[in-house]
UniProtKB/Swiss-Prot annotation:
The keyword Cytoplasm applies. GO terms for molecular function: ribosomal small subunit binding. One of several proteins that assist in the late maturation steps of the functional core of the 30S ribosomal subunit. Associates with free 30S ribosomal subunits (but not with 30S subunits that are part of 70S ribosomes or polysomes). Required for efficient processing of 16S rRNA. May interact with the 5'-terminal helix region of 16S rRNA. It is found in: Cytoplasm. The gene is rbfA. GO terms for biological process: maturation of SSU-rRNA. It comes from the Bacteria. Belongs to the RbfA family. Monomer. Binds 30S ribosomal subunits, but not 50S ribosomal subunits or 70S ribosomes. HAMAP family: RbfA. SUPFAM superfamilies: Ribosome-binding factor A, RbfA. Its main location: cytoplasm. The keyword Cytoplasm applies. This is Ribosome-binding factor A.
Length: 196
């Protein structure tokens, strides 16, 4: 059993090391050859499968949603060039590359806004003022939950010890976002799906 764990650990270490090398090579390629077409693009994370055959590159684009979609299309159109540039890795199989917009910062902004509203509500409650429920915050939370609920397999529920059921929290361990709803924490960690 120890050999199995040791082998799995080595795969994770190799994948992590490969992800760093891929991130470096792709960012250099973007900087030297596609800078004028893309604008400000940042690689936030690279995930590589254990067999090193596939890499998913998460990017953020400074600008509007249309500019982000255009940049993503340019990156996707240049996948073959990126894969060719990864040939310097000297591995048996050069990994395929897939690009995806990283929504972590967008979701974090929404969560920050919700946290701020929850704090303001807590201050009103602590001061003894009772007011209407913040329908905007509720609608915003529903929007976040609806967007993330489209992939129900990636949600994990866990009870929370908090007695305050209206509170919200943003957890930044391995990039999960958590929301405290009715004493249950819904966490969606960014983990590879079945294909990755």
């Amino acid at each position: 059993m120890d050999r199995v764990k040791e082998f799995a650990m080595k795969d994770q270490i190799r994948a992590h090391r490969m992800a760093g090398r891929i991130r470096h090579l792709i960012s250099r390629q973007i900087e030297t050859k596609l800078r004028d077409q893309l604008g400000l693009v940042t690689i936030t994370e690279v995930q590589v499968t254990g067999d090193l055959h596939h890499a998913k590159v998460f990017v953020t684009v400074y600008g509007t949603k249309d500019e982000a979609q255009t940049a993503l299309k340019i990156l996707e159109d240049n996948r073959a060039n990126f894969r060719r540039s990864l040939g310097v890795l000297k591995v048996r199989f050069v990994p395929t590359v897939e690009f995806e917009l990283d929504r972590l910062f967008e979701d974090a902004g929404i969560m920050d806004e919700l946290i701020q509203r929850a704090r303001e509500s807590d201050k009103r409650i602590a001061a003894g003022a009772s007011g209407p429920i913040d329908n905007d915050a509720t609608a915003l939370m529903d929007k976040v939950v609806d967007q993330e609920a489209r992939n129900p397999d990636s949600w994990h529920t866990a009870p929370t010890s908090s007695s305050h059921t209206a509170g919200l929290c943003l957890v930044r361990a391995s990039s999960p976002i958590a929301c405290n709803i009715d004493s249950t924490t819904l966490c969606k960690p960014r983990t590879p799906g079945p294909g990755l």
